[in-house]
């Protein structure tokens, strides 16, 4: 099993939803940026373990059809924060991002149980080893590049482009520019 927080309680206070969860030991990977090789290995180990889970037992659908439908609903409801777009898409509208996603959809999906937002703050480490995942609201059955793209983007932002190749090598994948661009663009809608 993959360690993750357990929900202890949920409630609404002053119109705000709250979850009370257990803590995981260790610290998120942003605390490991001074040890980039260790960070890459922990991230790769954690994602390999998550992606090795049996897809047949995952009831959560985050395949492209589901993500594009959710993204379209968020665009229609005005829930996409266009001011938070990455520099490559700054100045675009949420509708333009959705249109690009529809026009550039990759063929086929390499389905795994994916985290959905596999950035460094959402992966926990303890004593140089993988300790679990947090912020799993987008977890579900999805293309493995859903996680690899977000992980690579987070590596670039936090420790630099030079560490993408060691991370992918440790994970056991090769760079896929088209899928990287696609899933980073998809992330703008969420």
Regions found by a protein language model. Give the residues of each.
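An acidic site on a long C-lobe helix of protein kinase domains
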Residues: 39-42, 117, 144, 163
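Regulatory N- and C-terminal appendages and interdomain linkers associated
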Residues: 15-16, 188-190
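Localized chelating/binding microdomains
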Residues: 5, 39, 141, 187-188
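Active-site Asp-x-Gly
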Residues: 64, 108-113, 126-185
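Conserved catalytic-loop position in the HRD/HxD motif
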Residues: 112, 117, 122
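Active-site catalytic-loop/activation-segment of kinase and kinase-like phosphoryl-transfer enzymes
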Residues: 45, 61-105
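ATP-binding pocket architecture of kinase catalytic cores
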Residues: 1-63, 74, 108
């Amino acid at each position: 099993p993959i360690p993750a927080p357990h929900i202890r309680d949920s409630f609404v206070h002053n119109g705000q939803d709250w979850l009370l969860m257990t803590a995981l030991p260790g610290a998120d990977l942003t605390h490991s940026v001074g040890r980039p090789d260790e960070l890459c290995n922990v991230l790769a180990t954690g994602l390999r373990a998550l992606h090795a889970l049996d897809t047949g037992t995952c009831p959560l659908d985050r395949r492209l059809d589901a993500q594009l439908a959710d993204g379209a609903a968020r665009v229609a409801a005005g829930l996409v924060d266009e001011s938070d777009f990455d520099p490559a898409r700054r100045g675009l509208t949420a509708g333009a991002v959705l249109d690009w996603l529809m026009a550039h959809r990759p063929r086929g999906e390499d389905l795994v149980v994916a985290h959905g937002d596999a950035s460094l703050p959402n992966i926990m480490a303890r004593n140089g080893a993988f300790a679990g995942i947090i912020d799993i609201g987008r977890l579900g059955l999805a293309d493995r590049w859903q996680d690899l793209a977000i992980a690579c983007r987070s590596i670039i932002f936090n420790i630099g482009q030079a560490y993408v190749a060691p991370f992918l090598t440790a994970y056991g994948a090769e760079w896929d520019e088209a899928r990287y661009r696609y899933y980073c663009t998809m992330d703008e809608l969420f």
